């Protein structure tokens, strides 16, 4: 399942979306803005943009590949 959304990702909702009793783990990565500077300005947030159709197509390809390569039942 690949979802492109504008709101922040809720890790509990993501886990529940692909929960399977046969699975023994749920692995996520969560990036945060670190205390850093860019060109002498404080970094407070990150903004992302996406070409939605391309992003969704590529995201679905990545998930399909992961499902074929690893012994997993789902990916979000």
What are these regions (language model features)?
Residues 1-76:
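N-terminal, polar/charged subdomain of small-to-medium soluble alpha/beta proteins
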